[in-house]
């Protein structure tokens, strides 16, 4: 804290200002580091989080599609099992109608599908499936119960002319199923063997010209050449050359005429008060003051007569001289004490004292 009248600085205030400035600097540095760190974390975290969420959504979508495909396959299998159960109920007797004409018989290599309970009409031949694995021979099953008599599409079948169809041949293999769900990406493989070094590339194009270098120093002056020939024709003077450099300063000139007086300056500020001066000479004596009031009357004194001596006590307790020492002709009662060293002693006594002296 600096005073306006002096350059005094409080050391405690200066130390407090320095400590506060250092604390502000530390706070600014910490806030800057935290801001930069948060920005770096944001830049690195947001892309990785987006990639992670994208992978999870893609895998979830694939799993959902796989579940949907599995559900469709199960539904297809259930339908095929149901058709197999329905197809197993229509069992015909073996070798029925052998040697008789049966209009529903087809070639041996063409499978037929029979459905209940009317006469079966073979459908179109399906596409050939892939070759399956050879199966083990199964055990012969028991004979089935005889089926119900069939009917013609337009009228009832005559019992005498109803011929049992031959047993159903095994159906061909069905078409290939829907491709499965793609699997998850495998682990990264090992590093392969390093390839052969490549051949040298084509030479590159020449580079662009570089920047102009700095101006070099001036060269040395060459030798003076030979004098040229004097022209035969009239010499035409050339244009004047450039002005030369200014010459050096000349000697100082003589003193000039004194100039006119300048304007009066503004009055200066009031100076500080000077030291006190010497004391002045004494003044003239003043006039006499007014007469004071009359004082109160004094107390009566005492008189002790002893061997022709008079002892009197005045107001100040002084003892007067004997009667013999009174100057002759002092009939008015005035006396002077012996040993008049006291300049302030009174020159007269009161009337009561004079009466006592006269009586004595």
From Swiss-Prot:
Q: Where is the composition biased (Low complexity)?
A: 242-258
Arranged from A to Z, the UniProt key words for this protein are: Collagen, Cuticle, Disulfide bond, Repeat, Signal
Composition-biased stretches, type Pro residues, lie in 273-288
Under the cellular component aspect of Gene Ontology, which terms does the record hold? collagen trimer
Keyword check for Disulfide bond: yes
Q: Name one GO biological process term.
A: post-embryonic body morphogenesis
Q: Region entry Disordered: which residue ranges?
A: 127-158, 174-360
Q: State how changing residue 247 to R affects the protein, per the record.
A: In dpy2(E489)
The biased composition feature labelled Gly residues covers 189-198
Cystine pairings recorded for this chain: none
Q: Where is the region Triple-helical region?
A: 123-152, 174-230, 238-303
- Give GO terms: molecular function aspect only: structural constituent of collagen and cuticulin-based cuticle
Purpose:
Nematode cuticles are composed largely of collagen-like proteins. The cuticle functions both as an exoskeleton and as a barrier to protect the worm from its environment. Mutations in dpy-2 affects the body shape.
Family per similarity comment: Belongs to the cuticular collagen family.
Assembly and interactions?
Collagen polypeptide chains are complexed within the cuticle by disulfide bonds and other types of covalent cross-links.
Put simply, this protein is called Cuticle collagen dpy-2
- Native source organism of the sequence: Caenorhabditis elegans
Phylogenetic lineage: Eukaryota, Metazoa, Ecdysozoa, Nematoda, Chromadorea
Q: Which gene encodes it?
A: dpy-2
